[in-house]
Amino acid sequence: MRRRKAPVREVLPDPIYGNKVITKFINSLMYDGKKSTATTIMYGALEAIDKKGGEKKGIDIFNDAIENIKPLLEVKSRRVGGATYQVPVEVRPARQQALAIRWIISFARKRSERTMIDKLAAELLDAANSKGASFKKKEDTYKMAEANKAFAHYRW
């Protein structure tokens, strides 16, 4: 374990929307340091949402999607006297955002649309409308936490 807490690095806001969450999303989307490709995919998806989304802008739908997918509870394994319990714990805000971004990207990659831009746009629209695989993942996490409510007193 490290001696001190790692300093939180400052993330610069993205150049088009001036939004730090979009920068984090682009960084998570990136493979092998190819940031320009990830940026093209992200902005392409937001433009595609602008065309499909009706009266709402792409950036608003993106923000709604992130908010809808953020989990408030999750379960962590805790070993007590030879038995392992799934203990429900609250999720810190930074981790909520990180999990939401991670889930949206991973489920967008598994979709069947042709290009990654289309996959990401469709997943963001689904997430904003409280449906889709990433929303189901959040619901499943809640169900796990609810089912293991009895072990909440093992929190640390």
From Swiss-Prot:
GO terms for biological process: translation. CDD domains: uS7_Bacteria (cd14869). It comes from the Bacteria. GO terms for molecular function: rRNA binding; structural constituent of ribosome; tRNA binding. Keywords: Ribonucleoprotein, Ribosomal protein, RNA-binding, rRNA-binding, tRNA-binding. InterPro entries: Ribosomal_uS7 (IPR000235), Ribosomal_uS7_bac/org-type (IPR005717), Ribosomal_uS7_CS (IPR020606), Ribosomal_uS7_dom (IPR023798), Ribosomal_uS7_dom_sf (IPR036823). GO terms for cellular component: small ribosomal subunit. Belongs to the universal ribosomal protein uS7 family. HAMAP family: Ribosomal_uS7_B. Part of the 30S ribosomal subunit. Contacts proteins S9 and S11. One of the primary rRNA binding proteins, it binds directly to 16S rRNA where it nucleates assembly of the head domain of the 30S subunit. Is located at the subunit interface close to the decoding center, probably blocks exit of the E-site tRNA. This is Small ribosomal subunit protein uS7. The lineage of its organism: Bacteria, Pseudomonadati, Campylobacterota, Epsilonproteobacteria, Campylobacterales. The gene is rpsG.
